[in-house]
């Protein structure tokens, strides 16, 4: 028997994020569904107060993991324009889509044609008009420069070495002055022999060298091992 939701309330810190409280006292993150009745990755849908909410699983989304671990600042609001590098099958972009709403836009870059097709089926074909799908390689932003206009936030979640460099290169092309970047550091994708903390420092230093002010770093355990989320602003 499923556990009933007894309360839905706005998150105390982050715009467009909600807390679902269940009858057993547990709480889960959620966003308000931009396309009611439609799921992206099998998530629970909850109707409350005339709206529908999608449970946001921190084991499936690095951004949800960062929020669950107490990140203080997420630079995403209604109307925010985002460049998302490494969109995969669309779990986190779909929740960003809920948050930014119809005035926002998410340019979603994915390299794998197979995964890109899945992204199209789950997001674009389901009516998320604020998502712009781009089949491309995040290492070469000039290849999709004609698709992307200036963005407020550049976000990266790719299993590549030089993750911070890839993000900074894209920021040089597309980030508005004073814009923000969000870097998911996957330590094992960069150097399997080095301690994760050393890899985190290395990637953070790359951002600093490229002119970014580091605002916050949050480790993502227990949801993802040897991962961290970094939020920075272009000086």
From Swiss-Prot:
Keyword DNA repair assigned: no
BP GO terms, sorted: box C/D sno(s)RNA 3'-end processing; tRNA processing
Top enzyme class: transferase
GO molecular function: histone H2AQ104 methyltransferase activity; RNA binding; rRNA methyltransferase activity
InterPro entries the UniProt entry points to: Fibrillarin, Fibrillarin_CS, SAM-dependent_MTases_sf
Residues the record lists as binding S-adenosyl-L-methionine: 91-92, 110-111, 137-138, 157-160
NCBIfam families membership: PRK04266.1-1, PRK04266.1-2, PRK04266.1-3
Family from the record: Belongs to the methyltransferase superfamily. Fibrillarin family.
PANTHER family per record: FIBRILLARIN, RRNA 2-O-METHYLTRANSFERASE FIBRILLARIN
Free-text function comment from the UniProt entry: Involved in pre-rRNA and tRNA processing. Utilizes the methyl donor S-adenosyl-L-methionine to catalyze the site-specific 2'-hydroxyl methylation of ribose moieties in rRNA and tRNA. Site specificity is provided by a guide RNA that base pairs with the substrate. Methylation occurs at a characteristic distance from the sequence involved in base pairing with the guide RNA.
Full protein name: Fibrillarin-like rRNA/tRNA 2'-O-methyltransferase
High-level lineage: Archaea, Thermoproteota, Thermoprotei, Thermoproteales, Thermoproteaceae
